[in-house]
A protein has these predicted regions:
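Feature marks short, surface-exposed loop/turn motifs that line or immediately flank catalytic pockets
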Residues: 20, 85-89, 127, 181, ...
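Active-site mouth of glycoside hydrolases
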Residues: 1-229
């Protein structure tokens, strides 16, 4: 639920501010790249009294009961609630808590209980800033939490207050601590031991109050480096895990997760993908998330609601008011400031855009995230587990560099030539896996999990020079056994449907294997001949 209590510029329709923190160079916060600077612009354009009341309205309008109800209806069972310390603990001498913020959170937790949606309370923006990037709501791009003894103590006190208030709230599934610490900084090696100290002391102090709830600890560098979780962080209760973040830059295969999965096994702890997404990355999403599910790791899409064009996989999008540019032009480009009255009207209009019924729902994500309804699975996105769910017989690693250990022939489609750097090509993120096919010969097979509970058809797209004998089964029950005819491959120069700087995948023939009711694991095996498969196509709409 990004933007709700911890706004970020790129999700607001302003600026991202994700600039590199260069060694020895001070990097102040942007004019409107985080909640702290958004508050400053509010005070400049609308006045202090308006700004103070605005935040109460913002938090209650950005996340409403209807948001939680819709989230539940769509099949999701948890919501991550990113909070900023400054919303709950006033930034002034002494310890004074913002009771309105706690009242607001209490309402959200009540809705979560009503709709059976677990809440993961995410300490996204710690006191003084822990990340060095705008999402930590710091005053600049430093990581002052680790250097400032008072700020660290205030963070401990705030977390202890959460434990006191919510130790008996069963709907809280976990505490996510602390978001993306020590990212984009040359001080990572220096600060990592201080982060370890913070985690160890945090858990010791919190456990004196709350012995029940799970703590999910983030690695450094955008929650991706987890090597320092090499010992027990919760020695008395052993109720902790790792929160990992991964987007489409990460190759969707077990090898990408091997290090953290091994750590989790060694420490006997759980893994949770606390942030993931990838705008229009349906093939990536349905492949990566199934791998996570197979290894019993939950995942959380970033994020639920953002401004249109934010560039992340949000379920809901809202449009900014027509005159929003007057605020951003003033804040970022130095244009004339609207009058107080005019600016207040613009901000009021912004609040009106946040309601669920004013948003556009991006329903295309649901089928790929949940594997229900109408969706496609890339043939190369076959199940990783159990180990006998797939069998390749090649004596050479495939030439694409993807899933090298499975002994399958993965081949580029006709006419496609990847850039020299392959999957790590410079510039805009390329999608060579969209142009890779799974070649199956006699005795080879692959499996795919389908979670649609009603009736649907199963098809494949493929090409084959000659007839190929295939058997397809779901949960051991034969769906199809017979001959698929020769099929061609139409080379295309069309623009990719999602990525304007790439060509679309080639067109393959589609062959319907049959109709089935209920979820299960689809196994496709070639009995004789050879075929190259592009997609597994599931259509509830064609039953």
């Amino acid at each position: 639920m990004g933007n709700w209590d911890n706004p970020e510029g790129f999700m607001l329709g302003t600026q991202s501010g994700f600039g590199l923190f260069e060694p020895g160079k001070y990097a102040p916060m942007g004019r409107m790249d985080r909640g702290r600077s958004m508050d400053q612009i509010l005070r400049e354009t609308c006045g202090t009294k308006y700004a103070e009341e605005f935040w109460k309205r913002w938090r209650r309008l950005y996340l409403t009961e209807e948001d939680i109800a819709l989230l539940s209806r769509r099949g999701y069972n948890s919501v991550r609630l990113p909070i900023r310390a400054g919303s709950f603990l006033y930034e002034e001498p002494g310890i004074t808590y913002n009771e309105d913020s706690f009242a607001m959170l209490n309402d959200v937790l009540d809705w979560c209980e009503t709709y059976q949606v677990y809440a993961v309370v995410d300490f996204h923006a710690a006191t003084a800033g822990q990340s060095g990037i705008p999402c930590d709501d710091g005053v600049d791009n430093g990581q002052h939490l680790y250097d400032d003894e008072e700020s660290m103590e205030r963070m401990f006190l705030l977390m202890e207050e959460f434990m006191r208030r919510y130790k008996d709230r069963w709907i809280i599934g976990a505490y996510d601590c602390i978001n993306e610490p020590i990212s984009m900084t040359p001080r990572r090696e220096e600060l990592t031991p201080k982060l370890v100290y913070f985690y160890e002391k945090m858990i010791r102090r919190c456990r004196k109050i709350d012995q029940k709830h799970l703590f999910l600890l983030n690695g450094t560098q955008f929650s991706s480096l987890t090597y320092f979780f090499d010992h027990e962080f919760d020695p008395e209760y052993h109720n902790w895990g790792i929160s990992l973040h991964a987007y489409e830059m990460v190759v969707p295969e077990v090898a990408s997760l091997a290090s953290v999965l091994r750590t989790c096994r060694e420490q006997k702890i759980c893994l949770w993908m606390g942030e993931t997404g990838g705008r229009n990355e349906h093939a990536w999403q349905t492949t990566m998330y199934e791998i996570l599910a197979e290894y019993h790791a939950g995942y959380n899409l970033w994020c639920w609601k953002t401004v249109e064009g934010a560039g992340c996989a949000s379920i809901l999008n809202f449009n900014v008011p027509d005159e929003w540019h007057l605020i951003t032009d003033y804040a970022i480009n130095g244009a004339a400031k609207p009058s107080y009255e005019h600016a207040q009207a613009i901000w009021d209009s912004y609040l009106e855009c946040l309601a669920v019924d004013k948003c556009k729902e991006n329903t295309q994500y649901h089928p790929y995230l949940l594997r229900e309804g109408d969706f496609e699975i890339p043939a190369i996105g076959y199940n990783a587990l159990p180990m006998d769910s797939h069998r390749g017989l090649s004596d050479l690693p495939n030439a694409t560099g993807y899933r090298l250990y499975d002994r399958f022939e993965l081949v580029y489609e006709k006419g496609y030539h990847p850039e020299p750097a392959g999957f790590a090509a410079p510039g805009p993120i390329k999608h060579p896996r969209d142009h890779v096919q799974l070649q199956l010969g006699a005795g080879e097979y692959a499996s795919y999990t389908i979670r649609e509970k009603e009736t649907y058809t199963v098809s494949v797209t493929y090409c084959a020079d000659k007839e190929v004998k295939v058997q397809a089964a779901i949960q051991g029950e034969t769906l199809f056994e017979g001959v698929m005819p020769p099929a061609g491959e139409k080379v295309t120069s069309d623009v990719h449907p999602y990525f304007a700087y790439e060509t679309a995948p080639n067109t393959l023939e589609r062959f319907t294997l049959g109709t089935v009711t209920g979820e299960g694991i689809l196994k496709i095996e070639v009995l004789d001949g050879c075929a190259r498969f592009g997609q597994i196509v599931i259509r509830k709409s064609e039953k």
